[in-house]
Amino acid sequence: MAPKKKKVTGLIKLQIQAGQANPAPPVGPALGAHGVNIMEFCKAYNAATENQRGNVVPVEITVYEDRSFDFKLKTPPAAKLLLKAAGLQKGSGVPHTNKVGKVTMDQIREIAETKKEDLNARDIDAAAKIIAGTARSMGITVEG
């Protein structure tokens, strides 16, 4: 007979700097409310994201009835990848009036390759259009 499936009691979504999870907010309160061992998660997350330092890595934590958990790492947010590609700190406050940076279509395709698994696009061209739209809404001009 197959083992029983664990009952899910919660799903937590967080965006944390890679390799820098600690019990302080926002991690501690979010996990503590579900009774999860916070230090155990922090150690596991930091080990899993060690090679992505400098990026914000979204994580989806599934909490089970017995207070155990597992987590799934996502790709960094498109906005963060675009800011890095354009060499900016932040996007424009009025994106359709003030343009703050430029990215090439090659950079857009590279970001689309990275994000493809998290986007609901059938191919790279569709994913690139999604990323280009994000860039425009941040005041970043797409060249090419």
Swiss-Prot record:
One protein family per Pfam: Ribosomal_L11
Claim: Manganese is one of the keywords in the record: no
SUPFAM superfamilies from the UniProt entry: Ribosomal L11/L12e N-terminal domain (SSF54747), Ribosomal protein L11, C-terminal domain (SSF46906)
Gene Ontology cellular component list: cytosolic large ribosomal subunit
InterPro entries: Ribosomal_uL11, Ribosomal_uL11_bac-typ, Ribosomal_uL11_C, Ribosomal_uL11_C_sf, Ribosomal_uL11_CS, Ribosomal_uL11_N, Ribosomal_uL11_N_sf
SMART domains to which the protein is assigned, alphabetical: RL11
Keywords, alphabetical: Methylation, Ribonucleoprotein, Ribosomal protein, RNA-binding, rRNA-binding
Modification after translation, per record: One or more lysine residues are methylated.
Keyword Transit peptide: no
BP terms from Gene Ontology: translation
A GO molecular-function descriptor: large ribosomal subunit rRNA binding
Subunit structure: Part of the ribosomal stalk of the 50S ribosomal subunit. Interacts with L10 and the large rRNA to form the base of the stalk. L10 forms an elongated spine to which L12 dimers bind in a sequential fashion forming a multimeric L10(L12)X complex.
UniProt xrefs under HAMAP family: Ribosomal_uL11 (MF_00736)
Role: Forms part of the ribosomal stalk which helps the ribosome interact with GTP-bound translation factors.
Protein family (similarity comment): Belongs to the universal ribosomal protein uL11 family.
Name of the protein described by the UniProt record: Large ribosomal subunit protein uL11
UniProt organism field: Corynebacterium efficiens (strain DSM 44549 / YS-314 / AJ 12310 / JCM 11189 / NBRC 100395)
Gene behind this protein: rplK
